[in-house]
Amino acid sequence: GTGIASNIRRMLIEEGASEEEAQSKLFAFDVPGLLVDDTPGLTEPQKLYVQKRSNFATWKLESPGTITLMDVVRNARPSVLIGVTATNGLFNAEVLGQMAKNDERPIIFALSNPTSKTECTPEEVAVATKGRGLVATGSPFTPFMYEGKEFVTSQCNNMFIFPGVGLGALVSKASKITTKMFLQASKALSEFVTDEQRAKNMLLPDLTNIRKVSACVAKAVAIEARESGLGRILSDEELDRVIAKAQW
């Protein structure tokens, strides 16, 4: 979870946010609740994402002393939830319904595997958000119908990123793989989702396009390697050719 938070924080800063602004937008949880400055037993990675308890003095809490997920969803009004908790049902109807009040198209990542441990199911998101929630899961789910519309669930899997990152590093002869390469890979992936796929509430491309996705990701990584002085100086056109030649 802290690894995900680290990359989101880096992306926010890349997009122009200050370190303080980026930090303020991230609310990290563990078993005791929201990670705050007086949470006992914090690990070193967790300490990077604690909030000051004093920041929430005016919040209405479900239980004094503990800041729950529902407390944050109701008071901070986030638009994105990311679950890697292996806690089935954590994103319940109340939480999902509040997310739909926070944003017209709330984004829900229920990434825990297997399905018996997922934070919520895609159908639960559809019902609680009246079809407006965008969801991706760690486990595969079959398409379903809600209110006469087909919903296709994106499986958030490293197969969309890792092969392309490896290919991009290989063709560019990158001396190392950096966090920024992964950020550029993520941007390339996000731009690959079509309007038709978004209409089905998909957050990621269809798996049938995985070869093209990997080539697109590879090019983004190779360009970053070139721009950062870590890889070969090849034009965009040359990169297209060497990437196509390297795939099989």
Regions found by a protein language model. Give the residues of each.
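Glycine-rich phosphate/diphosphate-binding loop of Rossmann-like nucleotide-binding domains
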Residues: 1-80, 232
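Long hydrophobic segments that form regular secondary structure
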Residues: 64-131, 173
